[in-house]
Amino acid sequence: MTYSLNSWIKETEKKTKIKLDSYYISFVYLGIIMRLQMKKTVIFDLDGTLADIDIRRDKSLKPNGKLDWDIFAAPNSIMDWDTPNEPVIKMAQMFAKEGFKIVIFSGRNDRGFVATNHWLTKHNVPFDLLVLRPDKFKANSWPIADGNPATDEMRFMPDEILKKKMLDTFVDIDDVFLVVDDRDKVVKMWRDLGLNTFQVAPGDF
């Protein structure tokens, strides 16, 4: 909603029945404008950032050393083997307490959408929006009917391209205060967009 200064003065005086002096008006109105202009969204990655997935990755390896994606992406694997990255979760909690919108963008397959929600709740991770790689549950993991709908190619799309699409679809880039991620290629993409990005760990993969 957009207010002119005069309309704001009239509405406030009507509600409070107090005649506002010019100094008070200038101070309060400036505060309102500054708050409206503040960037209020923080984007978090999930695997390797909010969640430590080392155990799940190790237990999902085949004898030849390659990852068994069926085991790795299984909901019970997420719930049983992922551990919380407490410092990063604490960061999310602090931002949420200050009124920031917490958005989680992950390249994790949406077969684990329900389990991921349960895991986040179990470990007290605050979030306003969770977006996963769309596959089987697009209505939940990519909740948009038009504009930038989920497509089949997103199933195997590189994370840095997928997350750019997530940004374009779900968040106003001008509202992003900070991004927290771990993968080098994704961090580079965020920074190339001019977004302040905190890299929680080396991620050359």
Residue ranges of model-derived segments:
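Non-catalytic pre-domain segments flanking phosphatase-related domains
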Residues: 3-8, 12-46, 54-57
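Alpha-helical substrate-recognition element adjacent to the catalytic core
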Residues: 36-138
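Amphipathic coiled-coil/heptad-repeat helices and related helical stalk/stem segments
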Residues: 84-88, 160-163, 183
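Hydrophobic anchor at the start of a short beta-strand
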Residues: 102, 127, 177, 197-198
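Substrate-recognition "cap/lid" segment bordering the active-site pocket of phosphatases
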Residues: 110-177, 186
